[in-house]
């Protein structure tokens, strides 16, 4: 249920953010994406902490860029770091790389100002985590 709520709410927020995100926030997203990619490349389970923190900030930068304070509050209450860390720990290396690629595509969509693309990729990105959460590492 939480994943579905996050997918709906965060995709809505990303669509709004695509039309108004600042260059400073886009730069921050780039920095966070790079930090997650470096941590993911180590293959070290301890890197999950770094990925989890950066991932949480990545998603909140987007939601905050929407300018919808209530939406940010609701999403922050749903995106508990322990749940996200557990999700990442269940990811096979290929799935983790796909998640990192999603982050790059999200940035591209936001930079393009394409609200439909941003909304769709964020929704896909969040829903893709359900496969790992269900205990399978099979790619769809």
Locations of the language-model features?
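Conserved amphipathic alpha-helical segments that form helical-bundle/coiled-coil interaction surfaces
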Residues: 5-8, 12-14, 20-88, 100-109, ...
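Active-site loop of classical SDR/Rossmann-like NAD(P)-dependent oxidoreductases
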Residues: 95-96
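Short, charge-rich amphipathic alpha-helical segments embedded
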Residues: 125-140
């Amino acid at each position: 249920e939480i994943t579905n709520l996050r997918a709906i709410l965060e995709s809505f927020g990303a669509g709004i953010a695509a039309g108004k995100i600042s260059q400073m926030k886009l730069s921050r997203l780039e920095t966070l994406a790079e930090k997650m990619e470096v941590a993911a490349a180590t293959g070290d389970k301890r890197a999950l902490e770094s990925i989890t923190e950066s991932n949480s900030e990545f998603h909140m930068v987007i939601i905050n860029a929407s300018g919808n304070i209530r939406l940010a509050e609701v999403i922050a209450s749903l995106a508990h770091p322990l749940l996200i860390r557990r999700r990442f720990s269940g990811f096979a290396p290929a799935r983790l790389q796909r998640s990192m690629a999603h982050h790059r595509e999200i940035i591209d969509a936001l930079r393009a100002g394409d609200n439909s693309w941003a909304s769709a990729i964020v929704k896909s990105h969040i829903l893709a985590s359900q496969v790992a959460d269900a205990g399978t590492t099979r790619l769809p």
